[in-house]
């Protein structure tokens, strides 16, 4: 008793960890038996106390933390600030997400710590506290949810939801919080189920691979070891953990004194001596060599000394112990346990939390600014990054502190700044250890409002989306969404016109209907058309073409902005350029009218190629009346035979295209002769490599036609016309109604009579239906699905025009002259197969006869019915029927002029008109023919027109550099049916204007429309100038990109911004009486050339102008590079004008000075009041779609005071983007936006929302694109730390064990193995190279793998002894593959054999065996053992047994599993002795070791000789353990 009283008494509660430590010390001191006795007493005491305490848990025991309220409030305040920064565009979405997660995570963690101390101080006996912190049940994070806050949760994809749950379970959750928290719960339930199974299977595989590893001998005699040294940055704790329980491989000396001998096991005492020695002489201490399972020389078992102490009782492991199975279970078991903790605390971004350096005292901080450069932190804050270790001094009042900041750290304060004590001054980049837990994640940012996209830097194409509309940002910059108000209603009349609003004045006052094509904005918007005219007049919109405006009324022109990036191009002289003036009707000059159906067409980006058509003239004389469908016949004056024959051959397949095109073509004929340029539709892809494709979102349809690269193309195409209208208006009809050429569905009819009409064949199922009222919609909709598959790459050569890269060119090669042509009426109906006809085949009917239930005929005549597989064709031929006596003498298909008698017919009478004679065969009779005589309308071609009659004189004076030619062509294929709907006209002949030039080196001509307004006159000019383009462009299938020329290899943003460059000029409605002409314009108005530096505009002055003889000269005061020339509208007053382009120059504020020549100042008085200019941030012209309305409430007015104006001259310019809260003048800017009106005393902002985007972010869409709310705007790719709960950890462990490729492991390891395999044999030669190379490779990879696995478990707080992992890794890496380099007599190439076996075989045979190290996974290693019974019981039973039988394998039953399967005694424990026979070899062990030492010394010499090479080529002599946690260095002491 007296003795006991002297013992120290500790009055202190202990937790689970303390008990663990106590037990291990008890075992060390007293051994197993006595310890178990003590623990029994503790157990009894525990149960007794628990019973008497009788813990109960009620809701009142859940005490919330008092400080929670203000902590949460503080976090909310920070979040609010963050939102504001985001709104101002100061941080981008990822930075915002990161910071918000970290703010809430820190709050949550702080609360967790508070909770612990709060319980301890206020209520230490609280049952919640007792339970959770005793380690009995529940853990801190679960209690934290009960009484702290739940914090951030992950969604089912593992992404953070950045809305934290602020309540705890005691307070109760709101509905939103409840739903968010259910995510985690669901994920937890699923994970627990799935992962438990995974973990169990992992354990099974691990045990499988090492079940035969048993301790069978005391010593294997190895002399290899692995060196451990605390010098390599290893922590003391790890050093101790690594050494305790191991066996030394070599003697250890301190100075000359040996303090530990070889084969001695290391206990805590020895380790402490090592540590003391290292501390005393850190640089002289030698590394400690230990034995590990890796160095054991046995193949299928392990020796006591290589294994070391048994973890259970602290002595050397006993013989006969199944250490393999223990290892497998030790690794697998934590996995099974950890899957039950799948609770997500959600610290997603915390894996890379940085260490902070704080200021030691108040004072002024100083550092060398040359050694740092500015950067952004992960949270978007400004900081300095230091290149090298930086020395920072903090000067307080009486003391100078100096702080060292390691390299690559971020300094968060400025030089000479005053810092307070404990203020964070720097952030150390988190160590490389977190590297492997990073993953790349995409974050999509969606637009928060409708608007127009602008960006403030150049962009380039994402290489993998070369042909898409995705772009990459080369530097951090802002994207702006400029607010617009979409006008989607077609008849909405806006009464929003107020003073100083920008409106398209005439757009909404015109009667008629406007259909805006929003395909520019996004293809997903479904467009609804408001139908004002009823079914008949339904418009069909083609959604694939870019910005097109269709109207039945008149429309204001809109203008392309075609500017080069380098203004020098504009500054050339007048040569290579001409200007075409467009004329207004004088009374209605607000409407632009092109009389006589002249249509101008400027191709995409305004670039014309040689021989391009740029204007059409539809002569009313060649317009067909509304009589209906029919056939056009004509003769060529020079008709080459080869064309003729091939044309016959193709005629049948041409039929469907033609008719369908014709049928649509006239639907808009009265209202509109101008359609979108078809150059989108036909594209050649001639020189693919040569053309850079940079177009953006104009999707091309060039794939709708088949390309035939031979010279003639499809010959039928030569005879086709440049029929633009129907295709443009209705989408390309070839796409919708196309024949399926590849599918063999053509029958070429042999009947002579059918051949004559080029009848449509089977392929045309729904390709063209007549557009009667009933089938009109069907034919458009149904056929689209069936024939929507476009064919690639087509080139169309129509009637001598070659489609070349999107513009139509005139080719002399195929030009033919036609003197007259004829139109013959005929009707065709395509009816569904099932329809019941009311007329018979070969019957003769009158006009308006009922054909089917709801179809009536429009012509009278002969009916022919032809039934096809899928439909019925019904043709009606008008005309008289004759039965001639000598049918053979009649030439079918001939045209007979008037006044000629027809002798063969029964009657003979004079004809006033031409007739067309056809021969028809009577059915079921081979000889009998009848003749159909059909009336024909003749049209003569007029050769009288020439340039002089159509174009003004001063245009012709340009001919020295650009030539214009007129060409007539016929719009229809010879003898092809033109199907019509009946309330429209059809144009037979078109006259087109072709532009050409001589200079070979010029690539193309650029065309642009210029509109110039003065007080009472608005004039428009088409300007064409020759340009030598750097890169021509073509389009490709599904090409959504569009950027024009790229001068100097960078994007030209004016081009991306330009409209679909095409003037809309409506034809005159028939009832208007005034006829002016675009071509011969009224000579009353003198024209005046104003030659600015760009020398490109012509301005028609108003009547009786005072300045008829204005000077033609440049103003020398304007620097050439600083002016864009007069490319805009000079607006008389702001109250009414259209959104076209406005005047601008580079010297923004000086708008009213120096702009024009002095003597023009009076004329342009309007400049004094110039209110509007539109430019983008880089001072390029910006433009609006005609469908954007700027509403008044989007504009913010800011008034400048005169005193502040002078200072801000440098700051404000038009088009500049300004962020909210910027302090420009005395007041702050209240809203972000773009300046687009600058007055003397105020400016107007157009509201805009900035989004910050980082380098490499992907921008969706193109400059100037219209976005809708919710459209995807930018995609960021950022790295985040994986939330390293075991749900991610376990799969990773499994991947490493399976040697499967994972992000960070395999590239390094595989590369390293390759390097070793290659370099070592090269250095050392054969056979040493292979032997040593394979060994070093295996050693490297083993240690690397052990590290990676340990890292995953340690991150979870799980301690597993290295030796367990080593035993498994040893099995995974113990095989080599025999290579094909040297054929050996022993092994087959590709065979897997053990490394030791290969070495022994090589030594025994005295010949070199070539092999390479290989990394097997645990599954493959389990299937490559010495026991086929073990393999078969694992996987693929039948295959394994069959192979074993074929090979005649013998199983020696050395492992546990084989014996269990066969019911024998297992060779461990008590059954061990039966299997181990003392071999006579053991007596000779000493001599063996002697011999081996001889062999080893040779190898050692070789290694030392090549030390430098080895170490420079690899990481071997460097940090063996790769990471800072466990550095090992393998040295082979041989």
UniProtKB/Swiss-Prot annotation:
EC number: 2.7.7.6
One Pfam family it belongs to: RNA_pol_Rpb1_4
Cofactor note text: Binds 1 Zn(2+) ion per subunit.
Bias kind Basic and acidic residues: ranges: 644-668, 678-688
The reaction(s) this protein catalyses: RNA(n) + a ribonucleoside 5'-triphosphate = RNA(n+1) + diphosphate
Statement: the UniProt record of this protein carries the keyword Ligase: no
Cofactor(s), by name: Zn(2+)
Source organism superkingdom: Eukaryota
Keywords recorded for this protein, A-Z: Chloroplast, DNA-directed RNA polymerase, Metal-binding, Nucleotidyltransferase, Plastid, Transcription, Transferase, Zinc
Gene3D superfamilies for this protein: 1.10.132.30, 1.10.150.390, 1.10.1790.20, RNA polymerase Rpb1, domain 3
Protein's cellular compartments: Plastid, Chloroplast
Compositionally biased intervals (Acidic residues): 744-762, 770-789
Example GO biological process: DNA-templated transcription
Binding site for Zn(2+): 220, 296, 303, 306
PANTHER family according to UniProt: DNA-DIRECTED RNA POLYMERASE SUBUNIT BETA (PTHR34995:SF1)
Quaternary context: In plastids the minimal PEP RNA polymerase catalytic core is composed of four subunits: alpha, beta, beta', and beta''. When a (nuclear-encoded) sigma factor is associated with the core the holoenzyme is formed, which can initiate transcription.
Function summary: DNA-dependent RNA polymerase catalyzes the transcription of DNA into RNA using the four ribonucleoside triphosphates as substrates.
Family: Belongs to the RNA polymerase beta' chain family. RpoC2 subfamily.
Protein name in UniProt: DNA-directed RNA polymerase subunit beta''
Species in which this protein is naturally found: Saccharum hybrid
């Amino acid at each position: 008793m007296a003795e006991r009283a002297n013992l120290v008494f500790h009055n202190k509660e202990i937790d689970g960890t303390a008990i663990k430590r106590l037990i291990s010390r008890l075992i060390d001191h007293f051994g197993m038996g006595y310890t178990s006795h003590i623990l029994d007493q503790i157990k009894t005491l525990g149960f007794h106390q628990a019973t008497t305490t009788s813990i109960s848990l009620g809701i009142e025991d859940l005490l919330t933390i008092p400080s929670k309220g203000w902590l949460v409030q503080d976090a909310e305040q920070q979040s609010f600030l963050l939102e504001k920064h985001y709104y101002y565009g100061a941080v981008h979405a990822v930075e915002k997400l990161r910071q918000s997660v970290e703010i809430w995570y820190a709050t949550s963690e702080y609360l967790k710590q508070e909770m612990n101390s709060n319980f301890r101080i206020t209520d230490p006996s609280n049952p919640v506290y007792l339970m959770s912190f005793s380690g009995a049940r529940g853990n801190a994070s679960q209690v934290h949810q009960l009484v702290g806050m739940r914090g951030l949760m992950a969604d089912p994809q593992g992404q953070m939801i950045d809305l934290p749950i602020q309540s705890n379970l005691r307070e109760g959750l709101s509905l939103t919080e409840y739903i968010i928290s259910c995510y985690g719960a669901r994920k937890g339930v699923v994970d627990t189920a799935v992962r438990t199974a995974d973990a169990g299977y992992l354990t099974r595989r691990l045990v499988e691979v090492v079940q035969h590893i048993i301790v069978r001998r005391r010593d294997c005699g190895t002399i290899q070891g692995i060196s451990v040294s605390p010098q390599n940055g290893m922590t003391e704790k790890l050093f101790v953990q690594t050494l305790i329980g191991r066996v030394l491989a070599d003697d250890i000396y301190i100075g000359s004194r040996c303090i530990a001998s070889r084969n001695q096991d290391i206990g805590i005492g020895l380790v402490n001596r090592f540590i003391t020695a290292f501390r005393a002489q850190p640089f002289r201490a030698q590394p400690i060599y230990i034995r590990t399972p890796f160095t054991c020389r046995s193949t299928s078992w392990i020796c006591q000394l290589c294994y070391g102490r048994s973890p259970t009782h602290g002595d050397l492991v006993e013989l006969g112990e199944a250490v393999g199975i223990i290892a497998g279970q030790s690794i697998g078991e934590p996995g099974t346990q950890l899957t039950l903790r799948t609770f997500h605390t959600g610290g997603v971004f915390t894996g890379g939390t940085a260490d902070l350096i704080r200021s030691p005292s108040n004072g002024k901080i100083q550092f060398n600014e040359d050694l740092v450069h500015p950067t952004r932190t992960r949270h978007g804050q400004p900081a300095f990054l230091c290149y090298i270790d930086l020395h920072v001094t903090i000067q307080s009042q009486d003391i100078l502190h100096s702080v060292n900041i390691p390299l690559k750290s971020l300094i968060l304060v400025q030089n000479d700044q005053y810092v307070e004590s404990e203020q964070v001054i720097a952030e150390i980049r988190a160590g490389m250890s977190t590297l492997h837990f990073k993953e790349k994640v995409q974050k999509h940012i969606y637009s928060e409002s409708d608007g127009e996209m602008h960006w403030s830097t150049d962009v380039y194409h994402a290489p993998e989306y070369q042909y898409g509309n995705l772009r990459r940002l080369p530097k951090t910059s802002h994207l702006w969404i400029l607010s617009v108000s979409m006008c989607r209603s077609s008849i909405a009349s806006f009464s929003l016109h107020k003073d100083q609003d920008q409106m398209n004045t005439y757009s909404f006052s015109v009667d008629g209907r406007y259909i805006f094509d929003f395909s520019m904005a996004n293809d997903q918007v479904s467009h609804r058309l408001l139908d004002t005219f009823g079914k008949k007049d339904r418009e069909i919109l083609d959604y694939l073409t870019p910005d097109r405006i269709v109207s039945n009324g008149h429309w204001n022109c809109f203008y392309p902005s075609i500017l080069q990036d380098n203004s020098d191009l504009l500054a050339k002289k007048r040569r290579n350029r001409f200007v075409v003036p467009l004329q207004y009707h004088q009374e209605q000059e607000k409407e632009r009218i092109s009389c006589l159906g002249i249509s101008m067409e400027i191709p995409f980006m305004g670039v014309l190629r040689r021989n391009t058509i740029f204007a059409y003239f539809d002569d009313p004389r060649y317009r067909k009346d509304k009589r209906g469908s029919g056939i056009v016949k004509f003769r060529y004056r020079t008709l080459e035979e080869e064309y003729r024959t091939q044309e016959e051959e193709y005629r049948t397949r041409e039929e469907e295209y033609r008719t369908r095109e014709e049928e649509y073509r006239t639907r808009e004929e009265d209202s509109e002769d101008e359609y979108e340029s078809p150059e989108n539709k036909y594209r050649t892809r001639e020189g693919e490599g040569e053309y850079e494709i940079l177009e953006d979102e104009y999707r091309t349809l060039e794939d709708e036609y088949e390309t035939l690269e031979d010279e003639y193309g499809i010959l039928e195409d030569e005879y086709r016309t440049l029929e633009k209208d129907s295709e443009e208006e209705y989408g390309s009809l070839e796409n919708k109604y196309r024949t399926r050429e590849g599918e063999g569905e053509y029958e070429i009819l042999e009947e002579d009579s059918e051949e004559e009409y080029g009848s449509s064949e089977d392929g045309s199922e729904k390709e063209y239906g007549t557009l009667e009222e009933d089938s009109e919609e069907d034919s458009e909709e149904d056929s689209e699905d069936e024939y929507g598959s476009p064919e690639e790459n087509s080139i169309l050569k129509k009637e001598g025009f070659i489609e070349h890269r999107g513009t139509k060119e005139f080719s002399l090669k195929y030009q033919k002259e036609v003197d007259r042509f004829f139109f013959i009426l005929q009707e065709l109906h395509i009816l569904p197969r099932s329809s019941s006809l009311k007329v018979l085949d070969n019957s003769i009917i009158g006009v308006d006869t009922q054909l089917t239930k709801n179809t009536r005929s429009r012509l009278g005549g002969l009916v022919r019915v032809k039934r096809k597989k899928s439909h019925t064709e019904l043709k009606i031929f008008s005309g008289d029927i004759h039965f001639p006596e000598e049918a053979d003498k009649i030439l079918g298909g001939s045209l007979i002029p008037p006044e000629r008698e027809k002798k063969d017919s029964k009657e003979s009478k004079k004809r006033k008109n031409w007739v067309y004679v056809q021969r028809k065969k009577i059915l079921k009779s081979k000889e009998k023919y009848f003749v159909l005589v059909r009336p024909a309308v003749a049209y003569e071609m007029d050769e009288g027109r020439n340039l002089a009659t159509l174009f003004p004189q001063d245009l012709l004076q340009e001919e020295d550099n650009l030539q214009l030619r007129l060409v007539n062509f016929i719009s229809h294929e010879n003898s092809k049916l033109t199907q019509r709907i009946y309330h429209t006209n059809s144009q037979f002949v078109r006259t087109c204007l072709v532009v050409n030039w001589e200079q070979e080196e010029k690539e193309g001509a650029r065309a642009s429309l210029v509109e110039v307004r003065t007080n009472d006159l608005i004039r428009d000019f088409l300007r064409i100038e020759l340009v030598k383009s750097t890169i021509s462009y073509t389009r490709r299938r599904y090409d959504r990109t569009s950027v024009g020329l790229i001068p100097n290899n960078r994007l030209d943003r004016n081009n991306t911004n330009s409209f679909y460059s095409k003037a809309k000029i409506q034809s005159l409605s028939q009832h208007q009486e005034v006829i002016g002409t675009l071509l011969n314009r009224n000579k009353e108005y003198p024209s005046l050339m104003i030659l600015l530096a760009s020398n490109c505009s012509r301005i028609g002055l108003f009547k009786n102008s005072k300045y008829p003889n204005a000077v033609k000269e440049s103003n020398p005061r304007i620097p050439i590079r600083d002016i864009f020339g007069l490319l805009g509208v000079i607006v008389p007053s702001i109250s009414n004008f259209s959104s076209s382009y406005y005047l601008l120059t580079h010297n923004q504020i000086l708008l009213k000075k120096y702009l024009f020549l002095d003597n023009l100042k009076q004329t342009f008085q309007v400049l004094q009041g110039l209110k509007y200019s539109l430019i983008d941030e880089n001072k390029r012209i910006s433009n609006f779609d005609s469908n954007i309305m700027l509403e008044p409430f989007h504009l913010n007015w800011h008034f400048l005071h005169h005193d502040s104006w002078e200072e801000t001259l440098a700051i404000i310019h038009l088009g500049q983007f300004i962020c909210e809260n910027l302090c420009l003048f005395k007041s702050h800017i209240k809203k972000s936006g773009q300046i687009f009106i600058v007055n003397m005393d105020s400016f107007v902002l157009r509201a805009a929302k900035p989004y910050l985007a980082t380098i490499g972010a992907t921008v969706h869409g193109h400059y100037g694109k219209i976005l809708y709310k919710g459209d995807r705007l930018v995609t960021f790719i950022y790295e985040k730390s994986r939330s390293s709960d075991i749900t991610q950890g376990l799969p990773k462990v499994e991947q490493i064990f399976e040697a499967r490729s994972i992000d960070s492991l395999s590239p390094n390891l595989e590369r390293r193995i390759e390097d070793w395999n290659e370099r070592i044999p090269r250095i050392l030669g054969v056979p040493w190279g292979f032997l040593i190379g394979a060994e070093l490779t295996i050693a490297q990879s083993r240690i690397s793998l052990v590290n990676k696995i340990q890292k995953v478990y340690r991150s979870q707080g799980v301690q597993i002894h290295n030796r367990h992992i080593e035993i498994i890794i040893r099995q995974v890496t113990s095989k080599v593959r025999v290579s094909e380099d040297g054929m050996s007599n022993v092994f087959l190439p590709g065979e897997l054999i053990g490394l030791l076996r290969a070495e022994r075989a090589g030594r025994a045979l005295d010949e070199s065996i070539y092999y390479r190290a290989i990394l097997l996974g645990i599954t493959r290693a389990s299937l490559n053992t010495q026991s086929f019974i073990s393999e078969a019981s694992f996987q693929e039973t039948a295959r394994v047994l069959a192979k074993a039988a074929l090979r005649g394998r013998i199983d020696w039953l050395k492992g546990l599993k084989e014996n269990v399967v066969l019911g024998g005694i297992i060779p461990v424990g008590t059954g061990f002795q039966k299997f181990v026979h003392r071999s006579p070899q053991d007596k000779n062990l000493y001599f063996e070791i002697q011999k081996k030492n001889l062999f080893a010394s040779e190898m050692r010499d070789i290694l030392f000789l090549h030390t430098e090479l080895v170490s420079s080529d690899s990481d071997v002599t460097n940090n063996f353990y790769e990471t800072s946690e466990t550095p090992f260095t393998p040295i082979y002491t041989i």
